[in-house]
Amino acid sequence: MTATASASSVSGSLGRNELPPHLDENLLTPRFYTTEFDKAAKTDLEIARRDFQAMFNEMEADYNLKHFDRKASLARLNELSPKDKSVYESYLVRSVVSEFSGFLLFKEISNRFKKAKRPELGQFFQFLARDEARHAGFLGRALKEEGINIDLPNLPKKRAATFFPLSWVLYSLYLSEKIGYWRYILINRHLKAHPDKACAPLFDFFEPWCQDENRHGDCINMMMRCWPGMTKGFRGKILSRFFLWTVFLTHTLTVCERGDFYELLAIDPVKFDEEVIIQTNNTSKNAFPWVYNFEDGRFLEMRKEILNAFRSWRKASKLSKPIHFLKFVSLIARQFALPMEKTQAVRYS
């Protein structure tokens, strides 16, 4: 569906837990999060003082400020078919909700740090919130060019926030930023090699965008190191396994279920998904105590079976749905249990 709505009409027509145009309620829908803010305020920064100061200075410098031209046109350059137009709009909507979700979480963490008299950490997370707001703003402008205005400030009021413990938030945030980095940089490299496939100037901003994502991931890694218990022993291994598996599974289902966006850019969604997962798993060796071992190829090979089972489950009749669901769960459980390898990630203590 190609939706055109004003901010007021979107805001006025959506009830609680209803979604903007191009979003359906399912397991892959972007969400808003909350966490243990009081616990986060107790972060022991002194064990990471040198790294923190270096990252603080880098974030304060805001190297990408001039790379995001707020006056640049974000209108599509190419005429798209109604189907492709809907595909492009759907990508923008999902992306703007994800970026705005990150902004809200970072902003709330920043505010809580300041209230707890932790001004350095408060300012640090304000820098992260600044970047996420900038990204959401650019995506919002691109949507307006398509005739879609989403009332972002009111959207969280219509969506129940999901609570995650602090350790879950840090693991998932790290992966979210790093997988975002690899997604943006791979798309950017592809479009530089095939400029005729860049249907809008929005893609010109993907290079500084991916730099922000990479930097944010490093910031979250530093925060994880301030909580050594999160990455030690059995707890560190199970958290590494769970979040790598969850993020990779979600990425596979999201990319392949919405492969028409990547095909619009002349990108093979299956190969793109594989490369993003490989690179993110490798990058995670710098933060997590354990990562998946891809040497025997089983983890990556199972994606096709899992995707087919997922599609069969969603398309199945009411009577056969439980059978298809059990097959899907069996496959993802087998993938979850595949071998991992220990990393040499730096620890403060």
Swiss-Prot record:
<keyword id="KW-0408">Iron</keyword>
<dbReference type="Pfam" id="PF02915">
    <property type="entry name" value="Rubrerythrin"/>
</dbReference>
<dbReference type="GO" id="GO:0015979">
    <property type="term" value="P:photosynthesis"/>
</dbReference>
<dbReference type="InterPro" id="IPR003251">
    <property type="entry name" value="Rr_diiron-bd_dom"/>
</dbReference>
<dbReference type="GO" id="GO:0036068">
    <property type="term" value="P:light-independent chlorophyll biosynthetic process"/>
</dbReference>
<dbReference type="InterPro" id="IPR009078">
    <property type="entry name" value="Ferritin-like_SF"/>
</dbReference>
<keyword id="KW-0521">NADP</keyword>
<comment type="function">
    <text>Catalyzes the formation of the isocyclic ring in chlorophyll biosynthesis. Mediates the cyclase reaction, which results in the formation of divinylprotochlorophyllide (Pchlide) characteristic of all chlorophylls from magnesium-protoporphyrin IX 13-monomethyl ester (MgPMME).</text>
</comment>
<feature type="region of interest" description="Disordered">
    <location>
        <begin position="1"/>
        <end position="22"/>
    </location>
</feature>
<keyword id="KW-0479">Metal-binding</keyword>
<dbReference type="GO" id="GO:0005506">
    <property type="term" value="F:iron ion binding"/>
</dbReference>
<dbReference type="InterPro" id="IPR008434">
    <property type="entry name" value="AcsF"/>
</dbReference>
<keyword id="KW-0602">Photosynthesis</keyword>
<comment type="similarity">
    <text>Belongs to the AcsF family.</text>
</comment>
<comment type="pathway">
    <text>Porphyrin-containing compound metabolism; chlorophyll biosynthesis (light-independent).</text>
</comment>
<keyword id="KW-0149">Chlorophyll biosynthesis</keyword>
<keyword id="KW-0560">Oxidoreductase</keyword>
<dbReference type="GO" id="GO:0048529">
    <property type="term" value="F:magnesium-protoporphyrin IX monomethyl ester (oxidative) cyclase activity"/>
</dbReference>
<protein>
    <recommendedName>
        <fullName>Magnesium-protoporphyrin IX monomethyl ester [oxidative] cyclase</fullName>
        <ecNumber>1.14.13.81</ecNumber>
    </recommendedName>
</protein>
